[in-house]
Regions:
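Nucleotide-sugar donor phosphate/pyrophosphate-binding loop at the beta->alpha transition
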Residues: 107, 116-140, 174
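Short hydrophobic beta-strand element within catalytic cores of glycosyltransferases
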Residues: 286-289
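An aromatic- and histidine-rich active-site surface loop
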Residues: 84-106, 110-117
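A conserved mid-protein helix/loop that constitutes part of the nucleotide-sugar donor-binding site
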Residues: 16-21, 189, 193-212, 224, ...
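Conserved acidic donor-binding segment of nucleotide-sugar-dependent glycosyltransferases
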Residues: 301, 305-312, 321-326
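Aromatic "clamp/platform" in nucleotide-sugar-dependent glycosyltransferases that forms part
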Residues: 269
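Carbohydrate-associated surface elements
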Residues: 150, 171
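Nucleotide-activated donor-binding/catalytic signature segment of Leloir-type glycosyltransferases, i.e.
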Residues: 233-249
Length: 366
């Protein structure tokens, strides 16, 4: 197939990691892929298959795109005879206006990356507004891919039919994200967090919880990977030698850090079983995360520990449980690795995406 992908690429966030992985997987499967993007970096494609448009970044994750980009994308799709156009929703304004060209576009598939916000807060209200804008523009897309089943109910409430919805969770490169052949035991319990430094990811809760746990167990460390609005709070925290902040790094470098750790912690209050969680599981780490959305169903009791949202005491208790029991950490980690290998490798996810493309093409011909 000739496949067009409208997305940002190359940034260290879940959307870009998924977009990069889908592009790589489709090329590996023999498809001709064209990227429509405002990103400077697109790996794995020749220059003639990268079609750029101008954009102004409103924040690290969303852009105000050139008003001419939807028309330009439509024209290139027609010229190249693209079979299916895949839009990664929630990266820029182009996705909002492409549906106005639906009658001229090839069959379309859109992936929703926003998770439904649980609870009441300023941040969940922002996510709800973004949801409504995305849902409004999605009505004219032919097929819709959700990254979390908990999104399905809310999307159907807006009148989108179930037969156009497919749930294809994030995948993991299980060869890159693999357990260490041998882990050094220095007597320190190492916890790690990977993601945005933001309130919705529960970083403030994590810092409070680790501070309390470290007072009880000085032989413990916390490593944080990522950047975001809580950067200044992190900078203050790293004055303590027990906390290390690495910042933003290349995605390919994350496994070597995870392989040195004992447990992964992300007390988020929005979303489900995110990509960073599954990558940690693939490296054989037990997980401490929040009992929200599909996480309750997807993470078994013998794979990690679920805590209540906004609860630092719960996180402290979970750290105690894992910190005190090396055998438990090991057994949980082995089960996490097996689950990712069996259910969440990118090879399986790409095949599911291809099936959605085929359905979009078949339905458009009717």
């Amino acid at each position: 197939m000739k496949i067009g992908i409208v997305s940002k690429f190359g940034a260290p966030d879940g959307l870009c990691i998924r977009a990069d992985s889908v592009l790589k997987g489709l090329v590996k499967r023999g498809h001709e892929v064209h990227a429509f993007t405002h990103s400077k970096t697109v790996n794995g494609l020749p220059k003639e298959q990268i079609h750029r448009f101008k954009a102004v970044w409103l924040n690290p994750h969303y852009s105000l795109d050139s008003l001419s980009s939807p028309k330009s994308i439509t024209g290139i799709c027609r010229k190249l005879d693209i079979d299916v156009l895949h839009i990664q929703m929630n990266s820029g304004t182009t996705e909002m206006f492409l549906p106005f060209y639906a009658h001229l576009l090839p069959p379309t598939t859109v992936t929703f990356h926003l998770a439904y916000a649980a609870g009441r807060s300023f941040y969940t209200s922002i996510f709800a507004i973004a949801w409504r804008g995305s849902l409004y523009s999605a009505r004219k897309y032919d097929e819709i891919i959700l990254v979390d089943p908990s999104q399905k109910h809310y999307i159907m409430e807006y009148g989108l039919p179930e037969d156009r919805l497919s749930v294809i969770r994030n995948g993991v490169d299980t060869e890159l994200f693999s357990p260490p052949t041998r882990k050094m035991d220095d007597g320190i319990i190492d916890f790690v967090y990977v993601g945005r430094l933001s309130f919705d990811k529960g970083v403030n809760i994590l810092l409070d919880a680790f501070g309390e746990y470290h007072q009880e167990n000085p032989d413990s460390r916390l490593t944080l990977i990522g950047d975001g609005m809580l950067k200044s709070q992190i900078e203050d925290a790293v004055e303590d030698d027990s906390i290390s902040w690495i910042g933003t790094i290349e995605h390919e470098r994350i496994p070597e850090i995870l392989q040195r750790m004992d447990a992964f912690v992300i007390p988020q209050n929005i979303g489900g079983l995110g990509l960073s969680v599954m990558e940690a599981m693939s490296c054989g780490l037990p997980v401490i995360t929040t009992a929200i959305g599909e996480t309750v169903r997807l993470l078994a009791n013998d794979e990690g520990i679920l805590v209540k949202p906004h609860s630092a005491p719960d996180v402290v208790d979970a750290m105690r449980i894992l910190g005190d029991d090396k055998n438990l950490r090991h057994s949980m980690g082995k089960r996490c690795r097996k689950k990712v290998e069996d259910q969440y490798s990118w090879k399986n996810q790409i095949q599911q995406i291809e099936q959605v493309y085929e359905r979009a093409i078949a339905n458009k011909k009717r």
